């Protein structure tokens, strides 16, 4: 069996994030990716963080926010937190929804 090449951990830097100018998914490691896509009107790029994991046998993609609001460092912290929850069998999306409801009351 052929061994796969190890994936880099923290492959992105703030400079790389700013410099990306073509649509696609750029992984940082630790279930964190930067998704770059063209805006609907086609005049600029939108960049946002996505946490991807498997929980309860299903793949879950969870947006962590736009790069203008959520820094690379903050996205990594959030991914670490949600990865731990997923390992415990907790759906991170449902967890975040409950967190937000608790803050509103």
Enumerate the predicted regions with their spans:
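Basic/aromatic DNA-contact patch characteristic of tyrosine site-specific recombinases
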Residues: 1-105
């Amino acid at each position: 069996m052929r061994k796969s090449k190890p994936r880099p951990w923290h492959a992105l830097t703030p400079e790389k994030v700013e410099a990306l100018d073509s649509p696609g998914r750029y992984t940082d490691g630790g279930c964190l990716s930067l998704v770059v896509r063209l805006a609907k009107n086609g005049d600029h790029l939108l960049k946002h963080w996505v946490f991807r994991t498997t929980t309860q046998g299903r793949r879950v993609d969870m947006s962590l926010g736009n790069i203008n609001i959520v820094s690379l460092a903050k996205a990594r912290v959030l991914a670490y937190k949600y990865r731990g929850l997923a390992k415990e069998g907790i759906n991170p999306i449902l967890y975040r929804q409950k967190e937000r409801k608790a803050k509103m009351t």
